[in-house]
Amino acid sequence: MRVCVIGGKLQGVEATYLAHKAGWEVLLVDKNPSPPAKGLCDLFYQVDVTGEKEFLPICRETQLLIPALENQKALDALHHLAQKHALPLAYDPLAYGISSSKLRSDKLFMDLALPVPLPWPKGKFPLIVKPSGSSGSDGVRRMNSPEELESFRLSQGTFDGWVIQEFLKGPSFSLEVLGSPEGYQTLQVTDLEMDASYDCKRVLAPTALGESEIKRFEEIALTISKGLDLRGIMDVEVILHEGQLKLLEIDARLPSQTPTAVYLSTGINMVELLGELYSKPSNPAVSCPPSPRGVVYEHLKASPGKLEISGEHIMANAGPLRLWENFFGADEAITNYEPHRAEWVATLIITAESRKKAWKRRCGVIEQIRTSCSMSAYLDPSPANSPSHQKS
């Protein structure tokens, strides 16, 4: 099968990696000349998808279009083109339109009576302030006092377009749902760990959540899917605060990071399932194995004398990445590493029979990198008041 991935940033890296694991050929399209996924694809086209004349011939060479971008103008152009020419596009514009706005998605959560952080002013300090239209940790700020919040308001001129909620302490978790109104399937829960700026630095599988919490998480995800009439895939993120799961955000698109961890832990390939969903009349059948493998998936930044674990933002501007096998003992790495480079970044992918064994392997990989590259300093920052693995 030949697929076209539109967008070569981190979602594009994810889609390309998993498409290759499915045995597919990947044509990558991006308007920028050197996106991260360029080093992973089979063919690259520097094309602006809003220009139909250039883009349509590429579409006709493929059996599936996978959007891996958040530019609304480009997404609208893709949807229009797919409707006009009957092209298979893995995109649900209505669900994405809600999930791409934190204000609209929070309203949906409240309409569905789902547990969410208290909005300000009901929620007390400290608060989290985040832009409605950005995904993940982009633009997220913590406010510890009324004075900080007022200073922020003055700098912005308004609170319009911002979500302001109580700051909750606790571990974060992710779960994907896939399907259509005919039926939905939850996949595997993964555990998320953040850097100091609340950007996800590490994904762990299988989850440390108990069975009752997993079941509750699945119920929440299925309720949202039905509320959206989702057709496609959606990522749901929650935080476990004082024994209760609270919804943080949703994204009705192929996410980055967690799909690879789920694939390596369970063998479930979300990109392959998307292909089945958009090319066959019935929903794909999915079953999780009884004994998933342990996975550690994390990002690191190397500089002279120092190795630092960091959020995925470090990968976005690293230029074309490539896939290395047996990278300092890791199963795989997606990286711009070269032996002569003093500064480089990598996403480490490490598996074992269990999560505990995968973590032990990961610590050995970190030590091997530090020894081989003469790095005496090691940092693994986390948000204040959050647990973290500080030592390898």
Task: Identify the meaning behind each predicted range.
Residues Q244-K246:
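Conserved protein kinase catalytic/activation segment
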Residues Y96-P171, S180-T186, R202-T223, R362, ...:
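Active-site nucleotide/adenylate-binding loops and adjacent lid/helix of ATP-dependent enzymes
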Residues M1-Y91, S354, K360-P381, Q390-K391:
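ATP-binding N-terminal substructure of ATP-dependent carboxylate-amine bond-forming enzymes
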Residues E166-D229, L240, D251-Y278, P290, ...:
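ATP-dependent carboxylate/phosphate-activation module, predominantly the ATP-grasp catalytic core
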Residues G275-S392:
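Peripheral (often C-terminal) accessory segments that flank ATP-dependent C-N-forming ligase machineries
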Residues L230-E242, D380-S382:
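A short glycine-rich, hydrophobically flanked beta-strand micro-motif that places a catalytic Asp/Glu
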Residues A37-L40, F55-P57, G97-R104, S197-D199, ...:
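Short, charged, surface-exposed secondary-structure boundary motifs
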Residues Q63-L64, V189, A342:
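Structural motif
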